[in-house]
């Protein structure tokens, strides 16, 4: 079943008036040349402190050259500095009150249940269900939940061509002049952010607790492993849900509960008894791999019904081990860019054009398989190899797309700087609990290596730079270490703000363990804290107005006073009230408080999903996910380079859209809050930080 795309309604009339004004400016500026270009390279998570350290070591010559040509400044991120929030600031020129993305995780205030913030897939409203079959009468929809227009939509209306490749928080992608492929937020064929499959004869390979994977114990029989590749659900079929005794489950009204079965493809892996070689037999192809070898992209076709078109996906196999154990890894099954079942591109067919010219590529939003590492399916070196494959693939795509770019706006996104910093921080930080001297000796400082690889991409743009081109390099945030996790919901419970059902010592919001009749505040997401507000939450008990405001003030003061008992360091640097930092039509959707953690601290994974745990409130982080950026905004600034002078001391992400539009002579709309970074302000712009200010940032040691 293919899905249609639904976008939020735009204020078309207001934009039409703006377009008329903008076209006047475009016409007036046409004497400067008809070949105006703006190139933006986005290196997610690139940190200005690391950049400056590498400048001193002479390791980033092309970044340095660009800074000397124009400028280099810290770039102020969003509050909170999470990627979906930050990129939405950049896309819309607004803060979260204007675009309604506040965290990776949002919640339904009526049910309290969490959901992903960036997009939503809605199944067909109308179906006919004869027996075990399901036939949709209407189409399903994929909704982009970010509000507000993307700035390149104004470029489109002024007939400025644009290429937007892999920008986060843009699935499904909004219209872009020449073409767009969606980035972070794009699911795999399961509808997840990335679920890999792993087949192993070693039962010890399968941990008790894991996520983001389908791990299958297998046996070798007659020299072969016979298994199936699991695909998406077959939405054209249904089968009864059975309980543990094999009986059909029914709902409260006595109706049978149904589920969609999983589509599968059988395969047989033949194992050479003497050599470390396997042959994978699929229904329409055979693949030979040596131990430690990766396959090329493999096209899979899942057939829901004989008369229904197949669902196409792509994947890669990795022969992790052949002897003495059999261990076979399969990437998440990605949407096939040559035949996408989901709306990953605009216009339809653009992803196919890219793949036909540059080869198949990961279409899932976050291709580096961090789950395979944290589940211990990958070693650190194996993750390094896989992440380098992603980077080389992205470079190949850049080379093709940049070769096609002649005029207008070009945006290209790299994820390697972000995922690499999340995972490999522990290799550069001897103070980190997960520091691994053996991996450091083997792999070196991987973050430095990735930055140097990005420097080579910068060189490619500098080679083509001309007087008609504005070149910008940016990141959405920087990085800090993750030394300890803070169990925020546990703190709320122990301090009387959150109550568990009677008899419970620990619990989970997802399992219904919270007593909402006695709960005044709860946390969901990485930086969000909500008041259990009467009239907003399904079982709210705190009255709006004075009672709510007193509670918000009390919580902010107590949270800011929390210290690490081990060293008396502040755990939380700053607590923001939403009304102090946001404005716009979606302020009422925001969390009541935004928690800005101090250097080295972050919300625990458990608390982010609403869990209440026992034990210490602070837990040492020994995971390889060792770098993070979900702290206070001022400790993780991004980078901003340009071949033009930046005439602002403290540029923000939301300043970039009006700056880019101004390069094409397009006036910004009234609801964009940013300022043109290349134009001297007519009135001095005051953007003082609360607390110590920007000087505190520059005084921070990197490690």
Predicted regions, residues:
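Beta-strand elements within well-structured catalytic alpha/beta cores of enzymes
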Residues: 35-52, 66, 90, 154-155, ...
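Low-complexity, glycine/alanine/valine/leucine- and proline-rich hydrophobic stretches
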Residues: 601-656
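A long, amphipathic alpha-helix that forms part
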Residues: 32-33, 51, 384-410, 426-473, ...
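Active-site-proximal N-terminal segment of extracellular/periplasmic enzymes that hydrolyze or transfer
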Residues: 30-72, 81, 202
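Secreted, luminal/periplasmic, and some membrane-associated catalytic domains
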Residues: 43, 57-58, 70-74, 81-85, ...
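Long, internal low-complexity/basic segments
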Residues: 34, 610, 650-657, 661-667, ...
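Bacterial N-terminal signal peptides
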Residues: 18-26
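C-terminal motif of bacterial Sec signal peptides marking the signal peptidase cleavage site
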Residues: 27-28, 702
């Amino acid at each position: 079943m293919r899905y249609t795309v639904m976008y939020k309604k735009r204020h078309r009339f207001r934009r039409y008036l703006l377009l008329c004004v903008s076209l006047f400016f475009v016409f007036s500026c046409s004497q400067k040349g008809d070949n105006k270009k703006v190139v933006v390279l986005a290196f997610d998570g690139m940190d200005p402190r690391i950049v400056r350290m590498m400048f001193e070591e002479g390791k980033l010559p092309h970044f340095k050259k660009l800074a000397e040509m124009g400028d280099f400044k810290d770039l102020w991120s969003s509050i909170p500095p999470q990627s979906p929030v930050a990129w939405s600031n950049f896309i819309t020129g607004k803060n979260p009150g204007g675009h309604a993305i506040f965290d990776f995780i949002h919640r339904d205030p009526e049910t309290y249940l969490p959901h992903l913030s960036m997009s939503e897939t809605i199944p067909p409203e109308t179906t006919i269900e004869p027996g075990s079959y399901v036939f949709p009468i209407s189409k399903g929809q994929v909704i982009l939940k970010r509000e507000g227009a993307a700035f390149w939509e104004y470029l489109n209306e002024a007939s400025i061509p644009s290429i937007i490749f892999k920008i986060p928080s843009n699935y499904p992608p909004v219209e872009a002049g020449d073409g767009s492929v969606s980035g972070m937020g794009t699911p795999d064929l399961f509808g997840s952010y990335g679920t890999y499959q792993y087949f192993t004869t070693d039962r010890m390979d399968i941990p008790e607790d894991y996520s983001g994977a389908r791990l299958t114990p297998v046996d070798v029989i007659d020299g072969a492993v016979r298994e199936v590749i699991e695909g998406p659900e077959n939405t054209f079929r249904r089968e009864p849900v059975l309980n543990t005794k094999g009986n059909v489950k029914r709902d409260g009204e006595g109706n049978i509960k149904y589920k969609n079965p999983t589509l599968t493809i059988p395969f047989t892996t033949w194992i050479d008894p003497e050599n470390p070689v396997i042959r994978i037999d699929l229904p329409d192809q055979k693949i030979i791999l040596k131990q430690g070898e990766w396959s090329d992209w493999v096209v899979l076709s899942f057939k829901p019904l004989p008369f229904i078109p197949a669902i196409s996906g792509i994947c890669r196999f990795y022969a992790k081990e052949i002897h003495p154990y059999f261990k076979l890894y399969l990437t998440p099954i990605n949407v096939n860019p040559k035949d996408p079942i989901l709306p990953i591109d605009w216009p339809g067919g653009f992803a196919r054009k890219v793949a036909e010219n540059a080869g198949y590529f990961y279409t899932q939003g976050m291709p580096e398989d961090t789950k395979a590492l944290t589940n211990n399916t990958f070693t650190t070196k194996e993750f390094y190899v896989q992440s380098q494959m992603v980077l080389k693939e992205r470079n190949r795509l850049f080379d093709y797309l940049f070769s096609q770019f002649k005029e207008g706006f070009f945006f290209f996104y790299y994820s390697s700087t972000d995922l690499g910093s999340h995972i490999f921080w522990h290799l550069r930080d001897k103070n980190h609990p997960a520091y691994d001297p053996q991996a450091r000796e083997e792999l070196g400082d991987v973050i430095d290596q990735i930055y140097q690889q990005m420097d080579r991409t910068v060189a490619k743009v500098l080679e083509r730079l001309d007087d008609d081109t504005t070149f910008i390099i940016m990141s959405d945030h920087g990085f800090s270490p993750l030394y300890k996790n803070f169990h925020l919901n546990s703190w709320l419970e122990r301090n009387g703000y959150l109550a568990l059902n009677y008899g419970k010592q620990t619990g989970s919001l997802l399992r219904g363990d919270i007593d909402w009749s006695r709960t005044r505040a709860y946390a969901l997401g990485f930086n969000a804290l909500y008041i259990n507000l009467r009239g907003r939450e399904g079982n709210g008990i705190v009255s709006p107005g004075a009672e709510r405001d007193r509670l918000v003030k009390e919580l902010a003061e107590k949270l800011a006073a929390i210290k690490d008992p081990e060293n008396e360091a502040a755990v939380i640097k700053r607590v923001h009230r939403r009304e102090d930092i946001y404005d716009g039509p979606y302020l009422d959707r925001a969390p009541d408080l935004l928690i800005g953690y101090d250097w080295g601290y972050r919300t625990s994974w458990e608390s982010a999903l609403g869990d209440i745990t026992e034990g210490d409130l602070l837990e040492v982080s020994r995971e390889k996910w060792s770098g993070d950026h979900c702290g206070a905004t001022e400790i993780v600034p991004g980078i901003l380079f340009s071949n033009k002078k930046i005439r602002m001391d403290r540029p923000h992400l939301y300043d970039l859209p009006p700056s880019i539009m101004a390069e094409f002579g397009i006036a910004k709309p009234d609801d964009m809050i940013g300022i043109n970074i290349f134009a001297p302000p007519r009135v001095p712009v005051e953007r003082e930080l609360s607390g110590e200010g920007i000087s505190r940032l520059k005084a921070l040691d990197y490690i």
